[in-house]
Amino acid sequence: MDNEELQQLVCRISLESFQKPFIHQAYFNGRLRSTGGRYLLQSHNIEINPKAFELYGIKEIQGIVLHELCHYHLHIEGKGYQHRDKEFRELLKKVKAPRFCSALHTSKPSIKKQRRYTYTCVNCQQLYIRKIKMNVEKYCCSKCLGKLELLK
């Protein structure tokens, strides 16, 4: 889906759900990170996170567009357009728009892999796993008091 198709989708949803035209611009903004979309108060444009389409498809985009159009139409009419406003919450229920979008952040793999040190006793082969490297000259086996050696 590109910006032109998104613009047509927003205009169609606006007419079907609100019976009012959407006369401004709707486009994808790849810089959005944690939000599905946003309504810009000064320009009246709507920005949509392209990651929402990639992860969840057209159904999620339609929900985000409905939500942002609630902000849009209430702001244009001079009514309460913020999330905390009663008029906004009522309009969300009326058009069956979601209050929140699905989670967009994918869990990143841990950057720093936890390092483990494995020691073994020379006499009885008792294993010791430690996060912090230790001086084998200073410590001995707790079972037989034998010498320790680093495996990894």
From Swiss-Prot:
Identify the GO cellular component terms for this protein: cytoplasm
Which coenzymes or cofactors are required? Answer: Zn(2+)
- The primary location reported for this protein is cytoplasm
* GO MF term list: zinc ion binding
Domain SprT-like residue range list: 6-151
The cofactor remark states:
Binds 1 zinc ion.
**One biological-process term from Gene Ontology?**
response to stress
Reading the lineage from the top rank, the first entry is Bacteria
Report residues binding Zn(2+): H67, H71
- One Pfam entry for this protein is SprT-like
The reply on keyword Zinc is: yes
SMART domains from the UniProt entry: SprT (SM00731)
- Any idea which residues are catalytic in this one? E68
Question: InterPro entries, from UniProt?
Answer: SprT-like_domain, Uncharacterised_SprT-like
Give the keywords, sorted. Answer: Cytoplasm, Metal-binding, Zinc
Q: Where in the cell is it found?
A: Cytoplasm
- Describe the family membership recorded for this protein in Swiss-Prot or TrEMBL: Belongs to the SprT family.
Q: Return the protein name.
A: Protein SprT-like
